[in-house]
């Protein structure tokens, strides 16, 4: 949900749409750092979350961060920005920060996965007492991005000695794009059995609910409105009726209209409403 006009505005927009959970950016996703969160705005956000009962709330980290990079300056900048994301989320009382693991810039994937874990370890040491979790997002697998195999996520967690400060966010579009065919009953069953075996269902803290413009195995990340893409409605219905995922949020990241992005706009976005209504009809 847009934070135009201040983070507390995202809660108002969520209420307009009848949301039960929420994902926000705490700053511009295409900038390294944002201006510090105003204390009054933090308190207003927390009050509105408590009043509305919207939970959980997570943030999404900047797209610029690359915890897998081998370039020293970019690595230092990425880790600093990552810690800033954690600080902002902690100040707002969020469950976690969703982050793409990273993109390999040189060498084998195994070494890049170790670099990701090392960067997370640095952040944990810098902020030893924060409650906000790091939620690794499973990716579509474009280029040399990491995290598109469950084995990648498992390796990062293993390098971190199984830290319980690490959770997972699964994106339905990314699952299909990376080759996990959840569109069939058998494929859905096999995918989550494999995830449980390699990573653990207990690590799963949130879903991104997006259809896919591209077919299974394309390794191209293109979100589509729910029911309008290559995934279809049945997999979402399975998710909503799967007892293992009861209580987990499904956060949509589909295209919005321009009018909902204005700082003064606390209005219903017809595209968000359409996708939410589709999901609710499947419950």
State where each predicted segment sits:
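Active-site beta-loop-alpha junctions enriched in small/polar residues
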Residues: 2-4, 27-29, 61-64, 102-104, ...
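N-terminal pre-domain/capping segments
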Residues: 1-61, 65-86
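Histidine-acidic metal/acid-base catalytic patches
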Residues: 154-283
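Active-site acidic/histidine proton-transfer and metal-coordination neighborhood
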Residues: 67-167, 271
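Charged helix-capping and loop-helix junction motifs
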Residues: 37-43, 79-82, 113-117, 149-153, ...
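Glycine-rich tight-turn/loop motif centered on a GG-T
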Residues: 34, 71-75, 106-110, 181, ...
């Amino acid at each position: 949900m847009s934070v135009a006009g201040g983070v507390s505005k995202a809660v108002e927009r969520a209420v307009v749409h009848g949301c039960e959970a929420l994902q926000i950016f705490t700053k511009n996703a295409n900038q390294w750092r944002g201006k510090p969160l105003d204390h009054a705005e933090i308190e207003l956000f927390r009050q509105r979350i408590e009043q509305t009962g919207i939970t959980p709330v997570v943030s999404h980290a900047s797209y610029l961060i690359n915890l897998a990079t081998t370039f020293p300056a970019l690595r230092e900048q990425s880790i600093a920005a990552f810690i800033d994301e954690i600080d902002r989320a902690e100040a707002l009382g969020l469950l976690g920060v969703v982050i793409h693991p990273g993109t390999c810039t040189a060498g084998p994937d195994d070494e890049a996965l170790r670099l990701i874990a090392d960067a997370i370890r640095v952040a944990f040491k810098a902020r030893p007492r924060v409650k906000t979790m790091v939620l690794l997002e499973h990716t579509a697998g474009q280029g040399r991005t990491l995290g598109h195999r469950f084995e990648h996520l498992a390796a990062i967690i293993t390098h971190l000695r199984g830290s319980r400060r690490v959770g997972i966010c699964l994106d339905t579009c990314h699952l299909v794009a990376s080759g996990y065919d959840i569109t069939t009953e058998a494929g859905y069953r096999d995918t989550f059995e494999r995830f449980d075996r390699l990573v653990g269902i207990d690590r799963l803290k949130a879903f991104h609910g997006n259809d896919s413009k591209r077919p299974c195995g394309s390794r191209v990340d293109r979100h589509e409105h729910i029911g309008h893409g290559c995934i279809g409605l049945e997999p979402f219905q399975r998710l909503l009726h799967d007892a293992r995922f009861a209580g987990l949020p499904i956060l949509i990241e589909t295209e919005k209209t321009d009018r909902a992005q204005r700082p003064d706009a606390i209005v219903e976005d017809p595209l968000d409403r359409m996708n939410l209504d589709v999901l609710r009809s499947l419950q």
